[in-house]
Amino acid sequence: MKRKTLTQYLVEQQRSAQALGPEVRLLIEVVARACKAISHAVSKGALGGVLGSLESENVQGEVQKKLDVLSNEILLEANEWGGHLAAMASEEMETIHLIPNRYPKGEYLLLFDPLDGSSNIDVNVSIGTIFSVLRAPHRVAGADVCEQDFLQPGSQQVAAGYAVYGPQTMLVLTIGNGVVGFTLDREMGSWVLTHESMRIPEDTKEFAINMSNMRHWAPPVKRYIDECLAGKTGPLGKDYNMRWIASMVADVHRILTRGGIFMYPWDAREPGKAGKLRLMYEANPMGLIVEQAGGAAIDGTGRILDIQPDKLHQRVSVILGSKNEVERVGRYHAEAHAS
């Protein structure tokens, strides 16, 4: 039987009772085309002269890789002319990117991490692109937006997704009614539906965390990991395996495929920061995807998608994945705060 393409899937969703709007459909297709271009650049590697770092830093104070900058430019150029967007925001830019006046403006906002896990670029480990779609406030329809218009809780996302550039290139997407996965057919140049309903098991025997930071964690996180390491004879009654790729897209993709819990918690080295990962274009889109796949996503004390952001590049502690494991970590935080 012939498989559906991304375009066919989106058209069917547009026709269905959920009524995906035509602007969102076209926007997702444009983002997907940009991800194909990024995938092509990633796959060329040293042959394309795209490996290595630049002398510049992004707004986060991180040294930019050549592919970081190229991926950011690809997404900006692909999305600014279509008439679907009012503005964009990126990990690589300090301020928002307004749609130029020479192009029509739409009613949506696009946020993205153009190349997540870029520290892995030069060592040929899976990396990816994360994106989130919000609706612009009605008061700004047809006019310029400001940073404040982006500061919406993750529960307001219209769509979210990521592309993972690995042995296969995949696009994982939610428009609020489950999670689907598409694989890039390189011969045909099209995204093909290969995963119709991605679900995360409620329980797991795998955790993903950077164990080298253990001495800096808060007690509830230490407690949970200690119990995982205790194995069958410990309070959780089962042996766990640890997995850590240092690429959020790759780690979350594994969890979507076979279950697990991903943790990038607050640590004591920077006590004034709530966490390391960015809320608006990392935690929120991944949180929506995980929840739509039957999992959970919290910052330790509450649901990530309920957080009201106060700045564009806000950071947050992230604990997401298999529902029962995430809820256990949440209980440990609640017990610690109550004592």
Curated annotation (Swiss-Prot):
Its cofactor is Mg(2+). Substrate binds at residues 116-119, 210, 276. Its EC number is 3.1.3.11. Keywords: Carbohydrate metabolism, Cytoplasm, Hydrolase, Magnesium, Metal-binding. It catalyses: beta-D-fructose 1,6-bisphosphate + H2O = beta-D-fructose 6-phosphate + phosphate. SUPFAM superfamilies: Carbohydrate phosphatase. GO terms for molecular function: fructose 1,6-bisphosphate 1-phosphatase activity; magnesium ion binding. Pathway: Carbohydrate biosynthesis; gluconeogenesis. The keyword Metal-binding applies. It is found in: Cytoplasm. GO terms for cellular component: cytosol. Gene3D superfamilies: 3.40.190.80, Fructose-1,6-Bisphosphatase, subunit A, domain 1 (3.30.540.10). GO terms for biological process: fructose 1,6-bisphosphate metabolic process; fructose 6-phosphate metabolic process; fructose metabolic process; gluconeogenesis; sucrose biosynthetic process. Transmembrane segments: none annotated. Mg(2+) 1 binds at residues 91, 113, 115. Binds 2 magnesium ions per subunit. It comes from the Bacteria. Mg(2+) 2 binds at residues 113, 116, 282. InterPro entries: FBPase_C_dom, FBPase_class-1, FBPase_N, FBPtase. Homotetramer. Belongs to the FBPase class 1 family. HAMAP family: FBPase_class1 (MF_01855). PANTHER family: FRUCTOSE-1,6-BISPHOSPHATASE-RELATED (PTHR11556), SEDOHEPTULOSE-1,7-BISPHOSPHATASE, CHLOROPLASTIC (PTHR11556:SF35). This is Fructose-1,6-bisphosphatase class 1. It comes from Bordetella pertussis (strain Tohama I / ATCC BAA-589 / NCTC 13251). The lineage of its organism: Bacteria, Pseudomonadati, Pseudomonadota, Betaproteobacteria, Burkholderiales. The gene is fbp.
